[in-house]
């Protein structure tokens, strides 16, 4: 059970990181899924406008005024259509970004949050006791709530001695936090070195 929980956690964290790394390509992904018909229509309109513009450039305004004016009107109409299609594409992108955000929440963020609360105190591995101060050991074994409750525990149990433990378990929530920090730091180092 512990191994499968750890495996699911690692897969979710890595998938979420991969999704964040690919966020630079988010507009292409959204265009491919939600905006393809509008993007194709816009591409066709721009191509047609370019052809008409080239035809207008090759036509002499003084010699063939009627043809040049007709092309000019067609270009003006295409400009308004291009502008409307671009506005429609922006609206579709906003809808796509909202939907992608919902998918990210449902498939990655929510399961990680559930794992943190439901299986947060599940021991992942153990460290030798006495390796860290008692406060740090309690955070490692019980999560971040132990750090917040440390003053209360100190006041309530001021005279009692904690029984000696051979090992200090590291809970899933702390392990997940440490994994996220390691990935964040590695990503920062790679981006810093590449720039």
Swiss-Prot record:
GO MF annotation, one: protein-membrane adaptor activity
Principal subcellular localisation of the protein: endoplasmic reticulum
Coiled-coil regions listed: 67-94
Annotated keywords: Coiled coil, Endoplasmic reticulum, ER-Golgi transport, Golgi apparatus, Membrane, Transmembrane, Transmembrane helix, Transport
One family name in Pfam for this protein: CHD5
InterPro entries in the cross-refs: Get1, Get1_fungi, Helix_hairpin_bin_sf
Lumenal compartment residues: 1-6, 126-169
Topological category with respect to the lipid bilayer: Multi-pass membrane protein
Record-annotated membrane-spanning stretches: 7-23, 105-125, 170-186
Gene Ontology annotations for the cellular component aspect, listed alphabetically: endoplasmic reticulum membrane; GET complex; Golgi membrane
GO BP, sorted A to Z: tail-anchored membrane protein insertion into ER membrane; vesicle-mediated transport
Intervals, Cytoplasmic compartment: 24-104, 187-195
Signal peptide range in chain numbering: none
Subcellular location: Endoplasmic reticulum membrane; Golgi apparatus membrane
Assembly, per entry: Component of the Golgi to ER traffic (GET) complex, which is composed of GET1, GET2 and GET3. Within the complex, GET1 and GET2 form a heterotetramer which is stabilized by phosphatidylinositol binding and which binds to the GET3 homodimer.
Function: Required for the post-translational delivery of tail-anchored (TA) proteins to the endoplasmic reticulum. Together with GET2, acts as a membrane receptor for soluble GET3, which recognizes and selectively binds the transmembrane domain of TA proteins in the cytosol. The GET complex cooperates with the HDEL receptor ERD2 to mediate the ATP-dependent retrieval of resident ER proteins that contain a C-terminal H-D-E-L retention signal from the Golgi to the ER.
Family the entry assigns: Belongs to the WRB/GET1 family.
Protein name as annotated: Golgi to ER traffic protein 1
Species in which this protein is naturally found: Lachancea thermotolerans (strain ATCC 56472 / CBS 6340 / NRRL Y-8284)
